Amino acid sequence: MQNKIIIHGARAHNLKNIDVEIPRDKLVVVTGLSGSGKSSLAFDTIYAEGQRRYVESLSAYARQFLGNMEKPDVDSIDGLSPAISIDQKTTSKNPRSTVGTVTEINDYLRLLYARVGTPYCINGHGAITASSAEQIVEQVLALPERTRMQILAPVVRRKKGQHKTVFEKIQKDGYVRVRVDGDIFDVTEVPELSKSKMHNIEVVIDRLVNKDGIRSRLFDSVEAALRLGDGYLMIDTMDGNELLFSEHYSCPVCGFTVPELEPRLFSFNAPFGSCPTCDGLGIKLEVDLDLVVPDPSKSLREGALAPWNPISSNYYPTMLEQAMASFGVDMDTPFEALTEEERDLVLYGSGDREFHFHYVNDFGGERNIDIPFEGVVTNVNRRYHETNSDYTRNVMRGYMNELTCATCHGYRLNDQALCVHVGGEEGTHIGQISELSIADHLQLLEELELTENESTIAKPIVKEIHDRLTFLNNVGLNYLTLSRAAGTLSGGESQRIRLATQIGSNLSGVLYILDEPSIGLHQRDNDRLIESLKKMRDLGNTLIVVEHDEDTMMQADWLIDVGPGAGEFGGEITASGTPKQVAKNKKSITGQYLSGKKFIPVPLERRSGNGRFIEIKGAAQNNLQSLDVRFPLGKFIAVTGVSGSGKSTLVNSILKKAVAQKLNRNADKPGKYHSISGIEHIERLIDIDQSPIGRTPRSNPATYTGVFDDIRDLFAQTNEAKIRGYKKGRFSFNVKGGRCEACSGDGIIKIEMHFLPDVYVPCEVCHGRRYNSETLEVHYKGKNIAEVLDMTVDDALVFFSAIPKIARKIQTIKDVGLGYVTLGQPATTLSGGEAQRMKLASELHKRSTGKSLYILDEPTTGLHTDDIARLLKVLERFVDDGNTVLVIEHNLDVIKSADHIIDLGPEGGDGGGQIVATGTPEEVAQVKESYTGHYLKVKLQQ
């Protein structure tokens, strides 16, 4: 077998016909500037070809289900293995997908509970066991010798009535005695029972004394009792003790029944096990009273009920007024001053009580009717569930929130599944074990107390669970719970979860391609991640990791630097070799940073801010431990801490949502906190994340930053356009008129090929230029609109230098380091880091008020150290204008450049949620308890 992967003539995207050799069974890091072609090499060439060759080997029937693989633009690749890609984009947003289901740990947990779990009665009557007649006989014979007993068959349990037919049937079956409510009677002499009281009736099957030779008689009596008692039987030992037995998993006292224990009972995705109220989601969409009555100081007449404020018709306000008049509720009293009874009437309706409703609509239609009053909450619920209009449903959804299901308390399962415990009655049910952090879960498994028989059954299952949990622990995810929804994980977290699943599969000879697995990881956890990667390599796998993290690069066996620039200035291999060899390479920008020739300097002084603060008191969402936090305004603030310490909860769930609620009237509820002050000092909140700037290829840098409007204005003002009577709209590829109608302005046409990949071909009419020939006859400085869209930002800056309005907007795109992108590049082809910087660019050219708060969650994702240097310059421009920039970040170059650090921790999950250190980087570096401070100290001394 070859010991190298040899690539000849790779041309995907911006790759310039490159040849490269990659050693097999090694940890290989591919690095380079954002947009240099790293992903084009790793994912679009190597992974695409490895995957395609594997799929090609399958039958045509199987291929149709797998989607089709396009052959990458490369001459040849030798030495490939089947490839598995672990990237960031493929996290499931399905609410049924959790950490437990993604890692398959749930499958093993379900098996564990089905095999060694014991059901306990939910009404507190102890363990529920199922016994065969044979087992019951053995237990009875184990009683002390000479024990006197009677065998009873329960036929009525806690039921009202006189039960005359029951006694007739008992007599008919030939039985003589019965026990009614604890007293023994001859079946013909039972006193008349009270109709309105609950009664218990048992048939006396046999009376025995425990001694040798009774087994056969006892067995017959037990079988008869089970038959008559529907699988239940009681042994009364005459000394006041009673033993209850059942052939079913059913409580002999109250009858609570559990089906046979099997894995599907513990699945919240199967109707058999899921909670019937929330269908296994753990949350239920309920009307939120805070959204229905946003301002309780208003009266009903002033519009206290938000859903019924008149928008298009006066129907609901009229109904409300007539109903309140009928039921005697004052429309002018503030809502909060109404009595509880009156508020209930307004919210939940009048029940059966009716009022007379008379209404005439705008078209003369009339209603004259006596009806019950529905109540606003009931009305919102009904309209949400019954409407056929998406618009109405969305409006009603605005008054609802997802609340924890009251039936299953968020555990997602039904009572029958949640009554099964492992480790005795004081043990845990499957819902509780899923709520534990992975670190606590591991500890619980180690302390699990099982009988010898249970241990034998559980050993292989527990080993599988333990291994998978250990992998999650080793990649820095010890703070997650198995019940955590997969959709709420960050890109780095979901990638490391899939990494743990792959390590658990113990495959060898596979080619793994990873996309920045260190994202969202604190330096402290990075070493464990690198160890995990080395473990995968040592199993005999090849790992190709696209990464910018210096530690990972230095620990790699082989380093490939793609560059030298980005976009059309990249696409070449600038250096390839061991990390030490690359560090000595003068052509490699990465090498210059690794050797310390280039570095991001520490700012000479820290800003003092404007003296104002946003202060949050009592932040207690998720693992935050009732924090009081001050965010100084007019500064560059970094929120730091190990993974899972509560950074995103504090910034995204509380601060961002609370500010958005006050400034933008956002309906999204912030997390739990006591109070927030200082929002009046800011006017705008700008959240700059890495989500795509457009979902379709029609969105591009020119349309997103707004510069395309100005360019179209410019073309409309040319003499040729004026002569032809073309307005600005003529130069849009989104509307009829100027665009090519053959491809609707897309420039490409999709041809479906069924068993072969869909083929995208340039439109034959416009040849990919999007516009019709008449539009393209209008020129500005010798270029038509299609040629302008094909220009890179750098070229466009020179071309439009004489028009300040356009040049200013294009300059901002260059300032964020995207000079290599073309103005018309489809938004769908931009990476997360590029999309984020495009958002920054569109903010840069807006007039600054100096009162904006910018929030960025890990802005360095996908960025090379050289890109980070540029990003910092842009962020500092915002702060120099008097604005506040708040970043959640692990990158030490960014952290050391901040004016103020808020470090959370000390650990992740339950061990976090506290403030470990605050202050300038120099101050935080002195705090011994701070992991961030420890790494920062080294960085500041470099």
Swiss-Prot record:
Instruction: Name the Gene Ontology molecular function terms of this record.
Output: ATP binding; ATP hydrolysis activity; DNA binding; excinuclease ABC activity; zinc ion binding
UniProt: ATP binding residues: 32-39, 641-648
**Keyword entries, A-Z:** ATP-binding, Cytoplasm, DNA damage, DNA excision, DNA repair, DNA-binding, Excision nuclease, Metal-binding, Nucleotide-binding, Repeat, SOS response, Zinc, Zinc-finger
Task: Show the InterPro entries listed in the entry.
Answer: AAA+_ATPase, ABC_transporter-like_ATP-bd, ABC_transporter-like_CS, ATP_grasp_subdomain_1, P-loop_NTPase, UvrA, UvrA_DNA-bd, UvrA_inter
- The segment(s) forming the ABC transporter domain are 308-589, 609-937
How is this protein annotated for GO cellular component?
cytoplasm; excinuclease repair complex
Record's SUPFAM superfamilies? P-loop containing nucleoside triphosphate hydrolases
- HAMAP family under this entry? UvrA
- Say what the protein does: The UvrABC repair system catalyzes the recognition and processing of DNA lesions. UvrA is an ATPase and a DNA-binding protein. A damage recognition complex composed of 2 UvrA and 2 UvrB subunits scans DNA for abnormalities. When the presence of a lesion has been verified by UvrB, the UvrA molecules dissociate.
Please name the PANTHER family in this protein's record: UVRABC SYSTEM PROTEIN A (PTHR43152:SF3)
Name of the protein in its database record: UvrABC system protein A
